[in-house]
């Protein structure tokens, strides 16, 4: 079951972080903390940041199986946002998030 309150709080926290390409360290650190709290048995950060000139690598999180015989699932996403992602203040209108109009929402994978 989805914890809607936690989902909204996490979304709002993530979109407020300034994270242009090659500057995703703050998002990376936050995701590591949240993945650990969700029960990841292993969290790996690769060296892609140093190879590509960024300040963080790709994250790989492993969660233990919770049922026998079910297939594995992989989720992928990126942590950066287009350059105009500074000063984002998301607004919830009904069930839809929007920007206030001065910025993008910057939520494509967040």
List the predicted regions and their residue ranges.
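Intrinsically disordered, low-complexity segments enriched in polar/charged residues with Gly/Pro
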Residues: 1, 47-48, 75-77
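Active-site metal-coordination/substrate-binding segment of hydrolases
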Residues: 55, 69-110
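N-terminal capping segment at the start of a domain
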Residues: 1-25
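Short amphipathic alpha-helical segments, especially helix-boundary/capping motifs
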Residues: 4-9, 35, 90-96
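A non-catalytic alpha/beta surface segment that caps or lines the substrate-entry region
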Residues: 20-69
């Amino acid at each position: 079951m989805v914890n809607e309150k936690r989902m909204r709080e996490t979304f709002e926290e993530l979109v407020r972080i300034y994270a242009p390409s090659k500057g995703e360290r703050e998002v990376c650190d936050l995701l590591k903390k949240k993945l650990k709290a969700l029960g990841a048995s292993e969290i790996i950060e690769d060296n892609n940041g140093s190879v590509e000139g960024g300040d963080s690598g790709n994250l790989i999180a492993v969660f233990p199986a919770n049922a026998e015989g079910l297939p594995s699932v992989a989720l992928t996403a990126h942590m950066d946002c287009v350059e105009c992602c500074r000063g984002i203040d998301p607004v919830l209108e009904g069930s839809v998030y929007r920007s206030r109009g001065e910025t993008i929402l910057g939520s494509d994978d967040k």
